[in-house]
C-alpha cells in the first residue's frame, strides 16, 4: 500500500476498506502528515482503514483552516468515487486529530453540516 496524493491530500487505500479516517495533524507538523505521522497512519491502513491525511498551514483563522481542510477532504472523496478507487457506496467516516487537528475536527463538526461516525481526539490543544 503506497501513499497517493489526491486533491491536496495524502491517501492510503487498503484493498477492502472498513471505514474512512480523516486525519489532521498538529500545528507544527501538519504540512506533511504522511511523513510525521507515518507509523500511526500506515498501521491504520494495514488494519483496513482508508486514510485521508489533509495537510494544512497554520494561521490564526482556525475556522478558515477548518473550511479548507474539509473542502480538500470532500474533494478527495469525490475523486476517489469518480475514479472507482473507492468502490463501497457507504463507509463510516471518523475524524482523527492530534493537537491543532483536534480543534479543527471540533470546529468542522460544530460549524459545518457533516456526518461523522465519531472523532478520535489525541492531545487536544486549545490555543
Name each region found by the language model.
Residues 12-14, 85, 117:
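Alpha/beta-hydrolase superfamily serine-hydrolase fold, recognizing
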Residues 89-127:
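Primarily recognizes the serine-hydrolase "nucleophile elbow" in alpha/beta-hydrolase
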Residues 38-42, 68-72, 124:
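Amphipathic alpha-helical scaffolding segments
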Residues 2-59:
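Short, surface-exposed "cap/lid" segments of acyl-processing enzymes
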Residues 41-47, 71, 110-114:
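Short, surface-exposed basic-aromatic patches at helix termini and helix-loop junctions that form
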Residues 51-54, 62, 82, 113:
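Short, solvent-exposed secondary-structure capping/transition elements
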Residues 32-35, 62-66, 105-107:
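A short acidic (Asp/Glu
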Residues 60-90:
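Alpha/beta-hydrolase active-site loop
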Amino acid at each position: 500500500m503506497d501513499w497517493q496524493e489526491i486533491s491536496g491530500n495524502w491517501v492510503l487505500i487498503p484493498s477492502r476498506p472498513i471505514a474512512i479516517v480523516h486525519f489532521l495533524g498538529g500545528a507544527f507538523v501538519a504540512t506533511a502528515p504522511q511523513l510525521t505521522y507515518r507509523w500511526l497512519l500506515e498501521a491504520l491502513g494495514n488494519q483496513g482503514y482508508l486514510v485521508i491525511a489533509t495537510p494544512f498551514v497554520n494561521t490564526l483563522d482556525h475556522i478558515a483552516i477548518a473550511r479548507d481542510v474539509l473542502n480538500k477532504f470532500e474533494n478527495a472523496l469525490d475523486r476517489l468515487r469518480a475514479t472507482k478507487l473507492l468502490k463501497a457506496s457507504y463507509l463510516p467516516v471518523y475524524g482523527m486529530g492530534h493537537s491543532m487537528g483536534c480543534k479543527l475536527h471540533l470546529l468542522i463538526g460544530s460549524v459545518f453540516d457533516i456526518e461523522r461516525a465519531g472523532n478520535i481526539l489525541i492531545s487536544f490543544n486549545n490555543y
